[in-house]
């Protein structure tokens, strides 16, 4: 619902970065309190369930693509994944491209998604998954080695926009931008990652 994602999607669809080749996403924060719901296996904790939905969903939304091959490496603590590194291939209207993501509940705060093409790059940062909380929401378009267009959204509140979009769907019959079917696709991607994930240790 946040306009930064709408802008990234529009730039990609307009061919601003040429042919899409790779998407990379990272979402991390530091949380060691084992009583926190995110660290409890009985409450469905884990970095993937808590924040992997964002790294998966953002790539799927902007590119309108689905994974066709996935692998994952997981670090487990107390029965939950505190670190997950996912790699794969996605396919959709922009063709096939590689995908990589990293989520962790044991690293310093970081949120960024990049969409790399053969002629440019789109970078969504400034805390894009909880925009304007950690930093100002912004999206960048990099082209020609030294040209950068930056758009910032200091006042956009994606929670308000979500409620407004829902209201329009009810009152006017306008299509909801993130329907249940889309959410099911993100859950399917997560299920696959857990099925193919390999536990590693440091």
What residue ranges belong to the model's regions?
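A short glycine-threonine-serine/GTX helix/turn-capping micro-motif
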Residues: 43-49, 149-157
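Residue-level signal for the nucleotide or nucleotide-sugar donor/cofactor binding architecture
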Residues: 3, 161, 178
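C-terminal helix-rich "cap/oligomerization" subdomain common to oxidoreductases
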Residues: 151, 165-202
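Contiguous beta-strand/loop segments that form the cofactor/metal-binding neighborhood of enzyme cores
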Residues: 56-131, 160-175, 191
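Short coil/turn segments
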Residues: 28, 127-129, 154-158
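Predominantly a Rossmann-like dinucleotide-binding segment in NAD(P)-dependent oxidoreductases
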Residues: 2-71
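Short alpha-helical
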Residues: 2-3, 158, 185
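Short polybasic amphipathic segments
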Residues: 113, 131-144
